[in-house]
């Protein structure tokens, strides 16, 4: 059992090393898009299932509250938090529409959808992306494995941040680090700090 625990740490470290080689450009591009969105008076909507729903909420909380520096709140909404809305849509329509209906109501041209799925094949996240495209929103997709069906929905103006792993737990661990990188880049671009602090 101890060896298995150590192996999990080693595998996580190696996945992060691989991601450090593969992902910086796409993370930087996504952060730049988010800064442009926020400066334009728009907002970021985020969605995912399970651990990815937690990641969407984590991202939204970091923007609405703060990441590491004192700054004004930034507009972000996690679409996985309103249980009344989610259960109403799932009950009356289908689970695949729990995010897309919210996007059709809340999304505006210039907004960004942060779509999170370790497999890239979550039906309700795919529907969310389709709804975002119909609202002239830009998409930042956090995926893993081969990118799944989500990768095929992205256009030139969108960004996929695909973790180079096939292991769900490792993908989730890197997704959290990516979210922290995005928040750090957003904060330091919008609110430059003296590096001595």
UniProtKB/Swiss-Prot annotation:
Enzymatic reactions: 2 D-sedoheptulose 7-phosphate = D-glycero-alpha-D-manno-heptose 7-phosphate + D-glycero-beta-D-manno-heptose 7-phosphate
Pathway assignment: Carbohydrate biosynthesis; D-glycero-D-manno-heptose 7-phosphate biosynthesis; D-glycero-alpha-D-manno-heptose 7-phosphate and D-glycero-beta-D-manno-heptose 7-phosphate from sedoheptulose 7-phosphate: step 1/1
Pfam short name (any one): SIS_2
EC number: 5.3.1.28
UniProt xrefs under SUPFAM superfamilies: SIS domain
Residues reported in the UniProt entry to bind substrate: 49-51, 62, 91-92, 117-119, 122, 172
Class of the enzyme per the UniProt entry, highest EC level: isomerase
Additional comment: The reaction produces a racemic mixture of D-glycero-alpha-D-manno-heptose 7-phosphate and D-glycero-beta-D-manno-heptose 7-phosphate.
Described function: Catalyzes the isomerization of sedoheptulose 7-phosphate in D-glycero-D-manno-heptose 7-phosphate.
Self-association state and partner proteins as the record states: Homotetramer.
Family of the protein in this entry: Belongs to the SIS family. GmhA subfamily.
The name this protein goes by in its record: Phosphoheptose isomerase
Record organism: Shewanella sp. (strain W3-18-1)
Source taxonomy: Bacteria, Pseudomonadati, Pseudomonadota, Gammaproteobacteria, Alteromonadales
Gene symbol of the encoding locus: gmhA
């Amino acid at each position: 059992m101890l060896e298995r625990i150590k192996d999990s740490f080693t595998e996580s470290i190696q996945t992060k090393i691989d991601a450090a080689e593969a992902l910086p450009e796409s993370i930087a591009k996504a952060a730049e898009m988010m800064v442009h969105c926020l400066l334009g008076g728009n907002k970021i909507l985020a969605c995912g299932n399970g651990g990815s729903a937690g990641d969407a909420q984590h991202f939204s909380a970091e923007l609405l509250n703060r990441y590491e520096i004192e700054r004004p709140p930034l507009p972000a909404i996690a679409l996985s938090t309103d249980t009344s809305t989610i259960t109403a849509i799932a009950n009356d329509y289908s689970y695949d529409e729990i995010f897309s209906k919210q996007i059709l109501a809340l999304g505006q041209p210039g907004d960004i959808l942060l779509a999170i799925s370790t497999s890239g094949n979550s039906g309700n996240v795919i529907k969310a992306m389709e709804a975002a495209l119909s609202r002239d929103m830009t998409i930042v997709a956090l995926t893993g494995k081969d990118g799944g069906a989500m990768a095929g929905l992205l256009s030139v103006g969108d960004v996929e941040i695909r973790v180079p792993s096939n292991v769900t737990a490792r993908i989730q661990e890197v997704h959290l680090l990516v979210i922290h990188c995005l928040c750090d880049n957003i904060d330091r671009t919008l609110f430059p700090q003296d590096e001595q602090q």
